[in-house]
Every structure is written in structure tokens, then in C-alpha cells.
Amino acid sequence: MKTEVTEKELKANADNAQNKATLADKIKRVPETVKDYIKKPQVWGFFVSLVVIALLAIAFFHPDASLGNQLRQHDMQQGAAIGQEVKAYMQENPGANEPRWTNSLFSGMPTFQISPSYPSNSLFNWINTLFGAGLPSPSNLLFMMMAGMLIMLLAMKVRWYYALIGAIAWGFSSYFVIIIGAGHIWKFVTLAYIPPTIGGIIMAYRGRWFVGSALAALFAMMQIESNHVQMTYYFLFVILSVIICYIIDAIRRKEYSRFLKATGALAVAAVLAVAANLPSLYNTYKYSKESMRGSHTELTNPNAETESTGGLDRSYITQYSYGCSESFSLLIPNIKGGASAKPVQGSIKPTSLLDVDGAADKVTNLNEGELQYLSQYVSQYFGEPEGTNGPVYVGAIICVLFLLGCFIVRGPLKWALLAMTLMSIMLALGRNMQWFTDLFIDYVPMYSSFRTVESILVIAEFTMPVLAIMALQKLLTTPNAYKKYFRPLCFSFGIVAVICLAGYIAPSLFGSAITENDQYISNMIASQLEYYGYPREAIAQYSINNPAIAQAVSDIRYGMVSADSMRSLLLVLATFAILMLCIKGKIKKSYGVAIIGLLTVLDLYMVDKRYLNHDSFCPPDLSAADPFPLNDNDRQILADTAMNYRVMDIPRFGSAEPSYHHKMIGGYHAAKLTRYQDLIDRHLSHFTSGEDVTQADFNVLDMLNAKYIIAGDNSLMVNPNALGNAWFVNEVKFVDNPDEEMAMLSVIEPDSVAVADKKFQKILASKATTVAPGDTIFETSYTPSSLTYSATSQKGGVAVFSEVYFPWGWEATIDGKPAEIARVNYVLRAIAVPAGHHKIEMRFNPQSVSTTVGIARTAVILIYLLLAGALVAVLLKDK
């Protein structure tokens, strides 16, 4: 027995020694392993592809990116305006904690969806620079988009040269170039990180669960950090469909263990990615319950549909719906005329119908007035949404290869890609396929939280190139492809060619050239001319209903459709010819792939340049100029040295620009507080809509401390009745529900009476007393998220503050002791103040921020450790 134990010990020691030697050998072999990896075609091909896409990204924005020319994007300017108060505070107070509240818009709101930056983000922000290859902006963005798709296709084991074409097709899809011009940068960056996230998922399910989950965790973390929840949400549908594919595959192969291992690893990756962004996600989620994005008004609403969505109004959700025939823009870019406006040196310039190539030849019979009408009032765009910066065009070559893939590619992934393509197109139709949209609004969680349904076409922009490249590789790598795939090849190309031919011969098949918007504009002009006394004959001539104008509009717009239809047809026929030559062995397949890649680049490159080109950029001197120059009203208002007052700008109530300089009653943000929206609907909108303005409406302005009012004619008025930063009231009236609370605003005099929901009765009921002579309260210091007041009263009382109430995060103290904040007058804060002289402080300090930041830091470190482990596993892997 003793001998047996000794033998076991000796054997174990020998095994351990062998293992140690093996590990040592592996470590010594790392340089050799790296060399072996670099020699692999997929690896060196990856680096070659990176060089190619970098050159393309630089070339597309040449010479502007290298010269330092910049795009003054509209959305970025809006973001700069509403974030200016916080930015200025941080510049004046370096090292201070970033304020989570701003008074720049809507009388005050949290910054969770304005400038969502958290200390934990600094641990991984550098990855954005690395992933952009250090290229100048915006070339770095285009590089990021293509690099992400390249990683995903390589993870799918697509050969590198096919993957390169797919990456280019994805990156140069027109929508992405258009949103760069519009300034939707964080949407763009989110989309750039989605393909490599899915690539990690695919790699995990294909057996490399450790490396795949590490990559998925990294790119999911970066994707979520980019903070465009709508895009992340849409691609959850794609991720779910991919997982379902691998469930089916695991069942068919009976490989349950591998599937469960990958799923478990990916679940950990998902948790880490979410945890790394917990400050943004949690606070956004919590805030959404108080905003238009995630809650509906508590007021009785005659529109029951608004409430049933649990989010945004149905009409608001579907406001920007793609037209049925407009969906063919995926194949024919000018199927609806392209863009209604384009960025030109920092401004948005409407497109004119007379600027279309060949338009001059079609308007020779028009007089000067008719030409003026076409030039000023008729856009090149004639689709259904109110306006657009350009179509969603994935490329004629990609469209036809996608259709081919539907026939020749096998496996569940094909069905997932096809299903997601159809789903995205149907949902993008919005109100034009209301029954389908309603299914998602009513039964799919969170779908009703997002508007601009046409943007879900990003899914089709993703799925179509992926299936197209799978089809191209399948066709050109299958032996006897001519015999196997001749019929589906002819069928696919034939269908697409017929559609293009129809657009060329009979463009009217895709809808009328005269839109409802054209008619609406014409009616508006007619009303104005009639008001100024023009005769009916003159009005009829200056109208879209003028047969000469209508004919010219139809000729020019249908000419655009025909021209682009022929363009797409030629690309389809050229691709068909090249593929036939390849599969029949007439030319080398490598030449065929190169030619198709070149055609894809030229196709998308030329279309993209229609919507973003050299004219879109500002030279450095213009870029450095103040984007929000002061006008006379601004100067007069800013001459007021008081620390905290508000401005009611009636002409620009819904604009972000005034927020750059002032604390505004209005503003622009898609996720404003629901209660404040109620106040706008019931009172503040009367100033901008032309409805009768009542004394109650002015009372609302007074209680919001609107010290300055810019009237409809841009004249500036000082409001002598503005109630200031805080005041004591004689009485608080308690009501049973929000309807009564809102109704009382039309009755009370807010300088002496406040109204509150009865749930605040315990805080305020016994405290309200008649204001005595000498009772005062005034603000002594102000920062965006910290307010200090000095209060003096003989008997104590209820102090009302002209600050927007928010149910969590605000903490109040009286002489350093905690005090409760109540809500009065539907949107304002109130505090019960004891008798005597006191210092009142209010700070916005959400505990959730510090808690979630600590969790996020831990998660980021774990993701880095996971990546390090994955790298070690790759380097030490046995040959």
C-alpha cells in the first residue's frame, strides 16, 4: 500500500513538472506564436483592411479634415447651448464635482440626458481615440464605423477581402454620413460599436467563448457609454435573433454544453458592460419615470391613446414615418428626391428644385414669378416625413446581393437577418403600417419611449450588407457555382433590374410628384396673398395648382427618379456580368472581388457626397467664431447683474439657442419633465400659439421668475410682477388630485397663495401663516446645483421657491439641519421655515450617482482583466 502511494505521488510530481514545463515552453513560444498569427491571411488581411479603410476615411473628408475645417452640426450646437451653463461652471471651478442640474432650459431640469458624464467614464474614454486610429475628425468616425463591421465579419469567419467590402458598404451607407453632417455624433458612435459587440457574441457561440465574451463586454461597454439608448435598444432585436439562431443550431447539433457555456460567459459580459455604465443607465432610467420618455401626464387627458402607450404619444412616435414607396430608397437613392435640406458652412440650407441637374431645360416655358415659386417654395425632396437630410441608401450592389443571399445562403442566421430586415422596414413605415406599429407600442417593452421610427432602418442597413457579403463569399467559393446558382442568380438580379427599369421608364409608379406638404405650403402662401389683397388670378398663378408649375415639378422630380433608377440598373447589370464571368471561370475570382469592391465604393461614395461635401465645412476662422452671437436683447438682459432670473423668449420658445446665454422658461429637449410639459400645454403655450393669453398665464410666468419677456415682435420687456427667487405665502390650499392642482393655478394669486397636493399636507399644513411686515427671503448664492437663501420671519411660514420641483436628489437644510421639500403650484418647491433668521440651502446631490460610479469603476477593471485573460489565452494556446 505504501509503495502504491509513493508511485502515485511520483506520478503526480512528474505530471506537475510536465505541466510547469509546458507552461514555461508556452511563455517562451509567445514571440513565435505572434509571428505565426501575423502570417495567417485573416490576420495580415485585417491590418491591410485597416489601412484601406483609413485611406478611404481620409479621402472622403479630404481636404477638410486635414485642414482643420469643421462641421457646425445643428444637433451639436443645440447640445452646446443647453450644456453651456454646466460647462462654464466647470471651467470656472476646475476640479469641482460636475453639476447634475441646469437652469438653462425649462426653468430647470437634471442633466442626465444633457451632459451625461461621470467620473468612471474616464477609465475607458481613451478607447474612442484608439478606435478612431487617431485620425482627424470626422475621418475618425468613418474609420470607427468600418473597423467595427470588419471585426464582426472576421469573427463570422468571412474571408478578409469579402469582410473589407462589407465594412465599406456598412460605413458608407448614406444614413451614417448624413448623421455626421447633422451632428448626431453619439448616435453614430453607438452604431459604430454595435457590429463588434455582435461579433463577440458570434465568436462566443462558435466555440471561442472566453475571447468572444471579452470582446462583447468591451464593445458593449463602449456602445452603452455613447448614450444613444434608442440605437442600442433597436439592436437588441438583432442580438436576440442571433441568439435564437444559435439555440436552434445547438438543438440541431445537440451541443447543449457549448451553447450554455457561451451563454453564461456572455451573460457575465452583459452584466459587466451594463455595470460599467450604471451611472448613466440607472439615472436615465430613474429620470425617465418623471420625463416625457417614460411617463404620461397625470392630468385627465381626452386622448386615451396617449396614456395607453405608457410613453410618448402615438402621433409623436410616428411623426417621422417612412413612406411605402420611399422604402425603395435602399436601392434607388433619389426615389423621393434625396434631401430637403443640406448642411452648408454651419447652417442648414433648403434644397431648391431648380438646383437639380437638367432642371433648367424643363422650365423654359415658365415666367419669372413661376420660377421664383419653384426656387423658393418647392424642395427637391417629395417623401412623406416633413423633411430629411437625405435618404437611407445601402447601395444597389448590396441590395441585389442581399436578395441573392436570401436564396443561396443556408442556416438559421440567414433567416434572422432576413426577418430583421423585413421587421425594420415595416416598423419604419410607422403610421403607414399602423397595425404593426401598434403591436410594438402596446406589447413590446420600451418601444413607445422612442420617436422617429424611420431611424429603425439602421437595422436593415446592418443586416443587408452582412447577408450580401455572405452571399458573395458563398457564390465565389462554392465549386460548380454556375451550375448550382445560375437560376437564383438570374432570378435575384432580374427582380432588382425590373424594379430599376420600372423606375426609369415609369417613375410615377412610385407615387405622385406633388405631395401634401407641397399643397400645404401652397395654401399658406395663397392665404397670405389673399390677406394682402392680391387678385385671385395672381394667387392662382403663384400656386402648386398652376398647371405649368405642377408640370415642371413633376418633370424635374420624376427626372431625378429616372436618372437614379438607370444608375442603379447599370450597377446591377455590371455586377451580374462580373459575377457570371467569375463563376464561369472567364476571369479570376480575386479580380472579380476587387472590381465589385471598387464599384461598391464608387456607388456609395458618390451618393454620400451629395449630402456631405466640401461646402458643408466651415474654415477654421469661421469655426472659431461664436456660434451664438449676442443680439441687442441679449446684451440688455446680461447687463442685469442679479444672479438668478429667467427669460421668456416667445419667438424662440422651443429653441435651444437662447439657453446658451440665459436661464430660459422654454428650451429644446426631447425628454423634458412631464409636469413641466403639462404647464406648457395648459399655460405657457398660449404665448406662442396665438391663443388668448389670460391673467393666469401671466401668473405662471411670474411664479417662474420670468423677469424678462421677449415679445413676438422681438421687443424686450421687463416684467415688474416677477416674484423673484423665493417668497412667503399667506395660505396653502390642498387639493385631491393633479387636475385640481392645475385648475387652481387659474384661480390663485401665486404671490400670496400656493396650491399643493394633499400628500404634502403633513409638511406644510400647520406652517402657513399670514406674512408679517418685515418677513423676507432672498437668494444669497447660486450655482447650477446649489442654492442658498437668507430668510427672516416673525412667526415662520411657507416659503415658495421659483425652482422646479424634482422628487429625488434635491436635499434641503435650514441652518444645517435637514428640511423636507414639498411641491406646490404643480411644479415649484416649497419649504416650511420656522420663525427667526435662518440660512436655507438646497443641493442637488443624487446619492445614486456616487453609488453607481463605484460599481462602474469595479466593472471596468473587471472587463480589462477579462481582456487581459483573453489575450493571454490566445498567446498561450497550443498550436
Regions inferred by a protein language model and the residue ranges of each:
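Conserved luminal/periplasmic juxtamembrane motif of membrane-embedded glycan-processing enzymes
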Residues: 2-774, 778-790, 796-802
